[in-house]
Amino acid sequence: MSAGDHERNDAWQRAVRAQFPIIAAHPELAYLDSAATSQKPQAVLDAVHTYLTSSNANAGRGTYPWANRTTEAVERARRRVAQFLGDPAPGHSTVHLTSGTTEGLRSVARDWLTGYLTDGDEILVPYADHRANLAPWLEAQDLLAARGVHVRVRPLPYQEASGDYDHRALSSVVGPRTRFVAATHVHHVYGGDMNVHRLRAAVGPDVPICLDAAQSVGHLPLRLDDPALDVDFVVFSGHKAFALPGTGAVWARNTRGPALRVGGWQGTPNTVGAVSLTAALDWLDTLGVDRVNAHVSALTTRLTDQLRHLPAYDVLGCPASLASSTELPTAQRRHGIVTFRHRDIRSDDLGFILYSHGFMVRADSLCQAGVDDTGGKDGSVRVSLHVYNTENEIDRLLAVLASLE
């Protein structure tokens, strides 16, 4: 990058950072926990304030102007999600607003999968990803068993060293009764792109795939109109993509198997959350997700390149050996998440030390399926980045980590 390009990038980054009031108000702190939740730009806060002070009402329960505007706001959020994701099947697809990824995955499991599977069917699910992408499928298995329908849940093969799915081993677990696959787009611990586009070739053209996109929406240019991303459900959390807590969505293609129909009386929707979700996606489109991805990827590379030279730390997933293999280089495979352990300091203790220096990180088992120890050998420290983070924050973090060698 030339000096001029560097100056322009710095100016862009300062302008973006200034749009986050909580970040601007605390320059002494570095928020490095965006995989847990994102901070909110002024545009989202303004949209919420405008709605609450001009047309706050219930949706679908009145004919007066405030109620009509609220109903339209909820419908607009659904349309905005479909547009943002590049909906390739607008004549068939549906968008259901949820409280987040966990509820969204449960909805697919409870409201769709339990009506789709028959006795003897098999499903492939990730046993080494976030617990929210495992528990709903096991719960669905139990619900079906109570009805006398017995299905087999098989682990999606993965490579322990990298955290990536073992695409070569998929052929050994895919069979004639494979009816459904659940997968993760970007791993919440390792930050790796899980190469989900390769799943379709392995499972065939007729098996529905559900994608947990909690760590990719808002980070990567996820476009469902790209034939390489041929999935049937996309589930994500709005609060990780600059919207308010308690927001999320399920996009359903509805061309493989029955249409997703969320069961039961829905009650009052999260109208404020819907307004915030639309505003957040508008803001992201204006900023440019490609630009966000480039900025965060550069910071991720800066951190991983230096952290690997500190002998006291073990970086989890995406090992350096991949950089010289036929796979994508390590730095390109990480998307804003770097997780590590100190060889002598417990992860929870390291988290406290880092906060004493102004760094807010996640330090525990990270909700990873099969990991229960929150602070000992199975615990880890996760640094997760977003558009408001800076090179200076990365360099200061590295200096503190180096001092603990």
Where are these regions (language model features)?
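Pyridoxal 5′-phosphate
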Residues: 1-405
